[in-house]
């Protein structure tokens, strides 16, 4: 399978390495984040993988969709445009799979957090909060993974109604608010944790990334799955769709 990479930064280089190490796929082309991209830029490709920045992704999206080559997106920071992007994908007849984090380990972690949030929901003495740490070069704050975890907690636990992630506030956090704390520190790859507390217990569900290989390998696997899915049913997909089908 031939991959075109949009973005040649740290994650782009990791995806390149994962493709070359697969023995199954090849890199068709690598496009820099500031390259002028058109529909023809993806001719001959089977899958596009985008690890750029929010603004570049949104500018390049129409050309990627017009090419009808399925797109795997790891670029974060465009959550507010999610409904617009989903509509664009559906109208184009192409396919796009988005995940804030393609690490299979992180996605196991997210599902564990969701289940823990569901299990404590009936017990009002249990509270839950979420935190994350990343390197100081990371642009979005909180991380896309943290926001996805927060959404999953709200879906699983009806006692939490909204997310609060401000750096400071002049009031206490209400019981129905889910606090999401973010720290930017040095060169930390990525740490996420859900903290659960009651009068008698402290429970911590956590994940620490040791390197970027897990993110890159998951993106390549998701691309292979999406290319097949595109021939059957084009549309907008997430990592949950991929895992649900793979895990049965």
Curated annotation (Swiss-Prot):
<dbReference type="Pfam" id="PF05173">
    <property type="entry name" value="DapB_C"/>
</dbReference>
<comment type="pathway">
    <text>Amino-acid biosynthesis; L-lysine biosynthesis via DAP pathway; (S)-tetrahydrodipicolinate from L-aspartate: step 4/4.</text>
</comment>
<keyword id="KW-0457">Lysine biosynthesis</keyword>
<feature type="active site" description="Proton donor/acceptor">
    <location>
        <position position="134"/>
    </location>
</feature>
<protein>
    <recommendedName>
        <fullName>4-hydroxy-tetrahydrodipicolinate reductase</fullName>
        <ecNumber>1.17.1.8</ecNumber>
    </recommendedName>
</protein>
<keyword id="KW-0520">NAD</keyword>
<dbReference type="InterPro" id="IPR023940">
    <property type="entry name" value="DHDPR_bac"/>
</dbReference>
<feature type="binding site">
    <location>
        <begin position="99"/>
        <end position="102"/>
    </location>
    <ligand>
        <name>NAD(+)</name>
    </ligand>
</feature>
<dbReference type="GO" id="GO:0008839">
    <property type="term" value="F:4-hydroxy-tetrahydrodipicolinate reductase"/>
</dbReference>
<keyword id="KW-0963">Cytoplasm</keyword>
<dbReference type="GO" id="GO:0016726">
    <property type="term" value="F:oxidoreductase activity, acting on CH or CH2 groups, NAD or NADP as acceptor"/>
</dbReference>
<comment type="similarity">
    <text>Belongs to the DapB family.</text>
</comment>
<feature type="binding site">
    <location>
        <begin position="144"/>
        <end position="145"/>
    </location>
    <ligand>
        <name>(S)-2,3,4,5-tetrahydrodipicolinate</name>
    </ligand>
</feature>
<feature type="active site" description="Proton donor">
    <location>
        <position position="138"/>
    </location>
</feature>
<keyword id="KW-0220">Diaminopimelate biosynthesis</keyword>
<keyword id="KW-0028">Amino-acid biosynthesis</keyword>
<dbReference type="GO" id="GO:0051287">
    <property type="term" value="F:NAD binding"/>
</dbReference>
<dbReference type="InterPro" id="IPR036291">
    <property type="entry name" value="NAD(P)-bd_dom_sf"/>
</dbReference>
<dbReference type="Pfam" id="PF01113">
    <property type="entry name" value="DapB_N"/>
</dbReference>
<feature type="binding site">
    <location>
        <begin position="74"/>
        <end position="76"/>
    </location>
    <ligand>
        <name>NAD(+)</name>
    </ligand>
</feature>
<dbReference type="InterPro" id="IPR000846">
    <property type="entry name" value="DapB_N"/>
</dbReference>
<dbReference type="GO" id="GO:0009089">
    <property type="term" value="P:lysine biosynthetic process via diaminopimelate"/>
</dbReference>
<dbReference type="InterPro" id="IPR022663">
    <property type="entry name" value="DapB_C"/>
</dbReference>
<dbReference type="GO" id="GO:0050661">
    <property type="term" value="F:NADP binding"/>
</dbReference>
<keyword id="KW-0560">Oxidoreductase</keyword>
<dbReference type="GO" id="GO:0019877">
    <property type="term" value="P:diaminopimelate biosynthetic process"/>
</dbReference>
<feature type="binding site">
    <location>
        <position position="135"/>
    </location>
    <ligand>
        <name>(S)-2,3,4,5-tetrahydrodipicolinate</name>
    </ligand>
</feature>
<keyword id="KW-0521">NADP</keyword>
<comment type="function">
    <text>Catalyzes the conversion of 4-hydroxy-tetrahydrodipicolinate (HTPA) to tetrahydrodipicolinate.</text>
</comment>
<dbReference type="GO" id="GO:0005829">
    <property type="term" value="C:cytosol"/>
</dbReference>
């Amino acid at each position: 399978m031939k991959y075109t990479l949009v973005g040649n930064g740290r994650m782009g280089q990791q995806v390149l390495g994962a493709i070359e190490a697969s023995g199954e796929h090849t890199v068709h082309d690598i496009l820099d984040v500031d390259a002028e991209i058109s529909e023809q830029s993806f001719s001959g490709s089977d899958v596009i993988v985008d690890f750029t920045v929010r603004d570049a992704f949104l500018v390049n999206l129409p050309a990627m969709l017009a090419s009808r080559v399925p797109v795997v997106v790891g670029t974060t920071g465009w959550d507010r445009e999610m409904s617009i992007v989903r509509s664009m994908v559906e109208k184009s007849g192409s396919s796009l799979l988005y995940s804030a984090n393609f690490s299979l380990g992180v996605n196991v972690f997210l599902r564990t957090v969701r289940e823990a949030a569901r299990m404590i929901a009936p017990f009002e003495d249990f509270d839950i909060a979420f935190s994350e740490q990343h390197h100081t070069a990371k642009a979005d704050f909180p991380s896309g993974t943290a926001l996805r975890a927060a959404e999953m907690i709200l879906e699983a636990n009806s006692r939490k109604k909204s997310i609060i992630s401000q750096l400071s506030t002049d009031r206490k956090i209400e019981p129905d608010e889910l606090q999401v704390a973010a720290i930017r520190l040095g060169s930390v790859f990525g740490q996420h944790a859900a903290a659960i507390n009651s009068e008698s217990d402290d429970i911590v569900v956590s994940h620490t990334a040791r390197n970027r290989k897990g993110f890159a390998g998951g993106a390549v696997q998701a691309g292979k799955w999406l290319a097949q899915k595109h021939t059957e049913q084009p549309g907008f997909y997430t990592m949950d769709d991929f895992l649900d089908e793979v895990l049965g």
